[in-house]
Regions:
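Conserved ATP-binding/catalytic segment of the ANL
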Residues: 418-475
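Nucleotide 5′-phosphate-binding alpha/beta core
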Residues: 1-140, 147-233, 241-278, 283-306, ...
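Short, structured coil segments at secondary-structure junctions
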Residues: 238-239, 330, 364, 393
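Short, flexible loop/turn elements at secondary-structure junctions
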Residues: 145, 155-157, 220-225, 309-312, ...
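Generic preference for hydrophobic
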Residues: 334, 397-399, 454
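Conserved AMP-binding/adenylate-forming
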Residues: 317, 340-442
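Conserved helix-loop-beta element of the AMP-binding
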Residues: 324-346
Length: 475
């Protein structure tokens, strides 16, 4: 396992962090410099991946990519990899609980080296726990087929995954008025006068000062290494009080077993506990959270509510069904992300959900924000009041046509590709399963750089993530 990125990569990453902070504080940055740094990082990562990751080395060999200094355009043309790589293992390995085999697969797709001890796990949940103790963090997701994706992160990449977004999301949230103007000014001064790593350390130590006025209500699980669950768990650390809809970890064994069927009594017991929490006790969990939310409201405390669209929809419907007069304190906010499918599998109209949140909770429109991300990347794209997802400057985004050829232009639609300079332990040159429209123009909100206007799953790609899974469970 590579302990540290090489010097060229580290220099590029440090430069991109500074640009992220500048973009957060001023809404603009030197886009040409950012692209130069992204190219430097991509070239350095290309060499590391080719030397350390067998799967990527094979891709390079098949593409005839044998040089040591490819440009960004060459990498885009020859080295982009579908995100299906993270579920490319034989499904029989999990069916047979062959975790030695799963470890061998991980070592082919990532720059990691799981121990023999981790391969002796009894089940999938224990396997993830044992790997975590070795400094290997598997973040999982699942489509509606039940085929699990596992993204392997070493300690460096894990730190980037958890912390990089903190370089710009607090400031972008402040721009929408979520925190008081004096805190926004203080945050802006810190962004302009501190090195990024020092700013992250300060956020770790004193982040609760920003959100200490808020009680947090999280419409997800209190544990588990699934993408949106981790976002909620991290945000909860900064709130004065945190309440989770499901006070239990999200078990990958349960998620897979519900869709594909249990293979052992132990697995069935985990599935039964999961269904009890999410289906049988669903109303009780909603009532418990709403009762706590009502108390916060009566005490005059602001609230942050976080979750996926379908769960927020049901929370709002419960408020109306119980005829609660919830008018949360001014400054309360709702953040959401994840799949836009409801429990019956239909798409939830975004405008309808935003209006319902305002009606049932009294949240002002500019305090309702959405984020777009995915399990495989180190970063988050926040949607602005103009309904655009702004792409932070460390990401190189590529729009691909049906033949996976890059499309040029300032307003293009196609399959989204992302080159992530902070993916150190696995290939970060990824073709996603999302079909998007990307524009490059000054946004009316004042923020510069490229932005995504619309998002859908690419043709033939299954619904992915917690939203799609829960929709299937509850259908």
């Amino acid at each position: 396992m590579t302990a540290f990125p090489d010097q060229a990569l580290k220099q590029a990453q440090d430069g991109l962090k500074k640009i992220m902070v500048q973009w957060a504080a001023t809404k603009t940055c030197d886009q040409d410099k950012a692209r130069t740094l992204r190219e430097q990082a991509a070239s350095a990562n290309y060499l590391r991946y080719r030397r350390s990751i067998p799967y990527f080395a094979k891709v390079c060999s098949m593409a005839g990519m044998n040089g040591d200094s490819p440009g960004l355009d060459q990498i885009i043309e020859h080295c982009m990899i579908p995100d299906d790589i993270f579920k490319s293992y034989p499904q029989g390995l999990l069916d047979d609980r062959d975790f030695q085999g799963m470890n061998r697969w991980l070592a082919k797709v990532g720059d990691i080296g799981p121990s023999q001890a981790a391969g002796k796990a009894r089940n999938m949940d224990q396997w993830l726990d044992l790997l975590k103790k070795e400094g290997i963090h598997l973040v999982f997701s699942s489509g509606t087929s039940g085929n699990m994706s596992f993204v392997p992160r070493d300690e460096n990449t894990w730190r980037h995954f958890l912390k990089n977004s903190l370089l710009y999301t607090p400031m972008t949230a402040a721009d929408q008025g979520v925190i008081p103007s004096w805190k926004k000014l203080a945050l802006k001064l810190l962004c302009q006068n501190m090195e990024p790593d020092a700013l992250l350390s300060l956020t770790d130590r004193y982040g609760r000062l920003i959100f200490r006025d808020f009680d947090g209500y999280f419409c997800n699980f209190s544990g588990g290494a699934q993408g949106i669950q981790l976002v909620g768990q991290e945000l909860a650390k900064y709130c004065r009080n945190a309440f989770f809809l499901y006070d239990a970890p999200l078990s990958p064994m349960a998620v897979r077993g519900i869709i594909r069927g249990a293979t052992a009594p132990e697995e069935q017991a985990v599935i039964d506990a999961f269904l009890k929490t999410t289906v049988h006790d669903k109303k009780a969990n909603y009532h418990r959270m709403l009762n706590a939310l009502e108390k916060s409201s009566k005490r005059g405390r602001k609230a942050i509510i976080f979750g996926t669209p379908y769960l927020l929809l049901e929370i709002c419907q419960e408020v109306k069904a119980r005829k609660l007069n919830l008018r949360l304190k001014k400054g309360s906010a709702v953040f959401f992300g994840g799949g836009w499918k409801s429990f019956d599998g239909n798409r939830i109209p975004e405008e309808e959900l935003v209006e319902l949140i305002g009606e049932s909770l009294g949240i002002e429109r500019n305090f309702i924000a959405e984020g777009y991300s995915m399990t495989e990347i180190q970063g988050l794209m926040l949607r602005c009041p103009e309904w655009r997802y702004h792409i932070p400057p460390h990401f190189e985004t590529v729009i691909l046509d049906p033949e996976l050829r890059p499309l040029g232009g300032d307003d293009v639609t196609g399959t989204l590709g992302i080159i992530d300079p902070f993916a150190e332990s696995y290939p970060g040159f990824l073709i996603t399963g999302d079909h998007v429209r990307r524009v490059k123009e000054q946004c009316p909100c004042g923020r510069g750089g490229p932005a995504i206007i619309s998002i859908a799953r690419s043709p033939g790609r299954e619904v992915k993530g917690c939203g799609g899974i829960m929709a299937k469970i509850n259908a």
